[in-house]
Structures are given as structure tokens and as C-alpha cells.
UniProtKB/Swiss-Prot annotation:
The modification N6-acetyllysine is found at residue 154. GO terms for biological process: actin cytoskeleton organization; angiogenesis; B cell receptor signaling pathway; cell-cell adhesion; cellular response to growth factor stimulus; defense response to bacterium; epidermal growth factor receptor signaling pathway; heart development. This is SHC-transforming protein 1. In response to a variety of growth factors, isoform p47Shc and isoform p52 bind to phosphorylated receptors through their phosphotyrosine binding (PID) and/or SH2 domains. The PID and SH2 domains bind to specific phosphorylated tyrosine residues in the Asn-Pro-Xaa-Tyr(P) motif. Isoform p47Shc and isoform p52Shc are in turn phosphorylated on three tyrosine residues within the extended proline-rich domain. These phosphotyrosines act as docking site for GRB2 and thereby are involved in Ras activation. It comes from Mus musculus.
Length: 579
């Protein structure tokens, strides 16, 4: 009787695999073949199969990065079992460093935690990503198995539009970056449940919702159901998520990509919903909820993921010198228009957006701290990806020693100065005026006793030696003949004159000569819009006007709203001044 030779044990170093006969006899399955560490492999990263039909989040389109460690920049990539493997190539190292410096690292951490354990795992150390997971020309987003749904040119250009229903938004009181991944997901899904209960006819409203836990109740605030249930056109592009009413073409919101911190789908009971957290001047930080037709929610999430990937590749091609974390920033559209906001307790940026605080050496600091030390402000350009408004050092023209100590700013004409807001160190402006022979009245803001407009253009004119606009006198004389011009008026006095939606008036700034403010009432909320840019030009985001009267008549006669910072102001009834 012949004895069968013993079956050889499977060696992972063998070139051939076990035959089907050997597999059946052994009763065990060979381990899965490990991916090649070659950096040239650009094959798509397959998502976990069990999660294909389940609701997902935007984060599930990104690689697993929970083991990312930044403590050892020189660390190499580890193999699947921890053995040192082939070091990442230079291109990967630079991409990983750019990822770390860009401020996107907190957004990409804890990705794919909702998916199962069947997908590939990649260990990342030293800020370097594995070759198959990342290359500069590759993809950092786990594409769907069928690939992206739309051509890149379309997402980078006009965008992709979906017809959905806007269900409202819920205020988020904490930064999403301060929360872990599971809590972020719970926040968005709890916001979806709150809106479903509040809006009649919403999908998933019939199910019983568990009481909101105490931690979530402290994170979520009030709901805003102003446009709840309205059919809208959602346009997804690399620049923004645009929400426009389908019938009247009114823009409900326009959230720049850098202001979006998290996006997620619903749970199995609310699978047709998409929620994302964004910041805007109207709702501050809020979770916006969209109801999609059946089967469309996954496509919307996938398109948002594609837009994020393309946006990050744009950032890699044009990285800024300095980057600020995206969740602290709200979008800035580069418009010369901006809303005049009431001065808050802690001073804010020249272009006023919630959550921004001026750095040391700004206009406000130097006014309030007479004789304070002069800090050095770095020179930087605005980020094309994160939209971060960064200070650019500007100096008084007569202070030669300060210019030698500080970095020279990039050449910036007057128009770019307004689009790229700058800080001016005005500590020695009074000395410069006295050296020039002009005494000038003392600044009322030095002791904080006199109120002032937050958008005070005077320091910019002094530091840049810009003469007053030559047409300011003629403009003032022309406005005196307009019944809706009230001269110098404070914010509260102007708001007291507004009674109905559509009421408006024009007033002169109490602290900035030559600056005029349009005050109007829209949806019960007063709006204050600046009309003159630093060059003395009356303009909106899209048009220039000969005068303030021309701007008012143009929008009244054509029944066109003025759009600023994502909100509208309609000019319907002028408020005449009292004679």
C-alpha cells in the first residue's frame, strides 16, 4: 500500500498558489495576496463590498488614515505586518507633507470608519502615504467601483446639478474638528431626524426617534426651517455647493468648498437624505439637510467626494505659503461688497465673518494699545483651496525702519487690496501726519469713547498714501438731492426707520468720509451694505456704477436684488428723510 506524500505547507513566498484540490483537502483558504508596494500602481481602491448598498458618508470615499502619525517625519512606510518596507518615493513624501500642511489632515483622519473590515488597510507613518493609496497624480479618494459619475472638467467648471428638496438647517454649536468621527456622524443624523419631525411630509418622519442624548443636545442648536420643503437645484463644483430655488431662481445659499467641514448620508431609515456642515454669515455653523429622490443620495455624496478630490489636487498645484484650518474660515467670494456688521466684543477681520479674530498688530490692536510693541506680520497670499483670508503686512510710507524689519508684501494694486484684505500697522500714522505738516484731528477710537464703523477705510488711505476720491464732493452734493439719503446716521438710528420688508435708505459713514452704507430690511432682518470700494468706485460684485444714485435706480427699476455674502436685499420702498 503506497503512502501518499505529506501535503506541503503553503509558503507565502512561493510563486504558485495552492491548487483547488489542495485547498479543499486542507480545509483552509490561503491568505489574501498583499498589494504590491510599487508607487506606480494607480489602480482604483475598491470600497468594502458590504457597504455598497448602505448609507455612507463623504468620509468613506477617503483612504483609511486613522493610524497617521506625524511625530517622526523621517519614518518609513511599514509593511502589512509591521516589517520595514520600501521607503516612499519623493513625490509621495512631498504630497504627504502638503497634505499635513494644508490643514486638510483633520478632515481626512478617521476616514472609512463606517465601512467594514473587508477593505484594504494602509498604515501611514511620517505623513507619507502608501504608493497604491496616494500619488500626486493619483487619487486620495476611494472611488466607487464604477468610477466617478461625471467628467472632471464638468465638476471643475459649471458643476453638476441635482433636483432635490431643501429641508432646512440645524445650528451646530461646536466645531466639527473638535469631535471624533462617530460623534460627527451622530450629529448629522440627529439633525436629519430633527428636520424630518419638524417638516410635514418628510420621508422617515413616521418612525419613532430616540430621545436626543445629552451630548448631542449640547452640540445642536436651533432649527431654521425658512425654506423647508422647497424644491431646489443643488449644483456641486470644486468651488462651492450652490442651492438655488427651482421655481424663482433665488439663491438660498452658496457654500464655498473651504467652508464645508463634514458631509454624511442618513441612517437606514433616512437613506434618502444628505447632510453637510458648513459656515455662512447667515446661519453661522449649521448642518444643512437635503432630501433626494429615491436612489440619488449616493450619487450626490459621490459627486461631493469627487469635488473634494479635484479641489485638493488644485491645492497641490498651487499651495499657499500659509494655511489656516478650514473649519475656522467662512467663504470669501472676493467681492468688493460686504455687509457692515456691528462691532462685536472681540474685534474681527476687516472683512467681517463669524469666527475670525485679528492677529496682533492689526488695525484694532494698534489703536487700542498705544505704544505697544510692533509685531512682524508674515506676507502670504490667499489660499486658492481653503479660501483662508490671511494678513498681509503693510506699512506707513514714512517709516523706513519698520519696512526693513518686516517682510516686503507682494505687489498689490488697489483693486487686489480690496479683494485680498490686508492689515495696516498704524501705530506711527500720527507721526507721519505731523511730519507731512498735517495736524489732523485726534483719532476718536484711541480711547474707545466714540463709536466707529468696523469697516474703517481711513488707515488704508493713510498708510498707502491714497488721496481722497476726487468725486466724493460731487457725490455728496448729488446725494443731498435724493430723498432716501439721510446723511450721517448710526446703525441703530437707521434700523429704527425701517418698518416693512423692502424698505431701504442710504446713509453716510460716521467715521469714514466718502463711504456710504445701504441699509435695508429683508425678511425682517436689517442689512447694512457698503457701497464704495477703496478706489472710490461705486460697485457691486458684478457691476460698476457711476454713482450711488445710479446703483439705487438700476436695482429698483429692474426689480433686481442685491446679493451679498449669500443673502439678498431687495430695494422696494425708499424711506424718505425728514425735512
Amino acid at each position: 500500500m503506497d503512502l501518499l506524500p505529506p501535503k506541503p505547507k503553503y509558503n507565502p513566498l512561493r510563486n504558485e498558489s495552492l491548487s483547488s484540490l489542495e485547498e479543499g483537502a486542507s480545509g483552509s483558504t490561503p491568505p489574501e495576496e498583499l498589494p504590491s508596494p510599487s508607487a506606480s500602481s494607480l489602480g482604483p481602491i475598491l470600497p468594502p463590498l458590504p457597504g455598497d448598498d448602505s448609507p455612507t458618508t463623504l468620509c468613506s470615499f477617503f483612504p483609511r488614515m486613522s493610524n497617521l502619525k506625524l511625530a517622526n517625519p523621517a519614518g518609513g512606510r511599514l509593511g502589512p505586518k509591521g516589517e520595514p518596507g520600501k521607503a516612499a518615493e519623493d513625490g509621495e513624501g512631498s504630497a504627504g507633507a502638503a497634505l499635513r500642511d494644508s490643514g486638510l489632515l483633520p478632515l481626512l483622519q478617521d476616514m472609512n470608519k463606517l465601512s467594514g473590515g473587508g477593505g484594504r488597510r494602509t498604515r501611514v507613518e511620517g505623513g507619507q502615504l502608501g504608493g497604491e493609496e496616494w500619488t500626486r497624480h493619483g487619487s486620495f479618494v476611494n472611488k466607487p467601483t464604477r468610477g466617478w459619475l461625471h467628467p472632471n472638467d464638468k465638476v471643475m467648471g459649471p458643476g453638476v446639478s441635482y433636483l432635490v428638496r431643501y429641508m432646512g438647517c440645524v445650528e451646530v454649536l461646536q466645531s466639527m474638528r473638535a469631535l471624533d468621527f462617530n460623534t460627527r456622524t451622530q450629529v448629522t443624523r440627529e439633525a436629519i431626524s430633527l428636520v424630518c419631525e419638524a417638516v410635514p411630509g418628510a420621508k422617515g418622519a413616521t418612525r419613532r426617534r430616540k430621545p436626543c442624548s445629552r451630548p448631542l443636545s449640547s452640540i445642536l442648536g436651533r432649527s431654521n426651517l425658512k425654506f423647508a420643503g422647497m424644491p431646489i437645484t443643488l449644483t456641486v463644483s470644486t468651488s462651492s455647493l450652490n442651492l438655488m430655488a427651482a421655481d424663482c431662481k433665488q439663491i438660498i445659499a452658496n457654500h464655498h468648498m473651504q467652508s464645508i467641514s463634514f458631509a454624511s448620508g442618513g441612517d437606514p431609515d433616512t437613506a434618502e437624505y444628505v447632510a453637510y456642515v458648513a459656515k455662512d454669515p447667515v446661519n453661522q455653523r449649521a448642518c444643512h439637510i437635503l432630501e433626494c429622490p429615491e436612489g440619488l443620495a449616493q450619487d450626490v455624496i459621490s459627486t461631493i467626494g469627487q469635488a473634494f478630490e479635484l479641489r485638493f489636487k488644485q491645492y497641490l498645484r498651487n499651495p499657499p505659503k500659509l494655511v489656516t484650518p478650514h473649519d475656522r474660515m467662512a467663504g470669501f467670494d472676493g467681492s468688493a461688497w460686504d455687509e457692515e456688521e456691528e462691532e462685536p466684543p472681540d474685534h474681527q477681520y476687516y472683512n467681517d465673518f463669524p469666527g475670525k479674530e485679528p492677529p496682533l498688530g492689526g488695525v484694532v490692536d494698534m489703536r487700542l494699545r498705544e505704544g505697544a510693541a510692533r509685531p512682524t506680520l508674515p506676507s502670504a497670499q490667499m489660499s486658492s483651496h481653503l479660501g483662508a483670508t490671511l494678513p498681509i503686512g503693510q506699512h506707513a510710507a514714512g517709516d523706513h525702519e519698520v519696512r526693513k524689519q518686516m517682510l516686503p508684501p507682494p505687489p498689490c494694486p488697489g483693486r487686489e487690496l480690496f479683494d485680498d484684505p490686508s492689515y495696516v500697522n498704524i501705530q506711527n500714522l500720527d507721526k507721519a501726519r505731523q511730519a507731512g505738516g498735517g495736524a489732523g484731528p485726534p483719532n476718536p477710537s484711541l480711547n474707545g469713547s466714540a463709536p466707529r464703523d468696523l469697516f474703517d477705510m481711513k488707515p488704508f488711505e493713510d498708510a498707502l498714501r491714497v488721496p481722497p476720491p476726487p468725486q466724493s464732493m460731487s457725490m455728496a452734493e448729488q446725494l443731498q438731492g435724493e430723498p432716501w439719503f439721510h446723511g450721517k446716521l448710526s446703525r441703530r438710528e437707521a434700523e429704527a426707520l425701517l418698518q416693512l420688508n423692502g424698505d431701504f435708505l442710504v446713509r453716510e459713514s460716521t467715521t469714514t468720509p466718502g463711504q456710504y452704507v445701504l441699509t435695508g430690511l429683508q425678511s425682517g432682518q436689517p442689512k447694512h451694505l457698503l457701497l464704495v470700494d477703496p478706489e472710490g468706485v461705486v460697485r457691486t460684485k458684478d457691476h460698476r456704477f457711476e454713482s450711488v444714485s445710479h446703483l439705487i435706480s438700476y436695482h429698483m427699476d429692474n426689480h433686481l436684488p442685491i446679493i451679498s455674502a449669500g443673502s439678498e436685499l431687495c430695494l422696494q420702498q425708499p424711506v424718505d428723510r425728514k425735512v
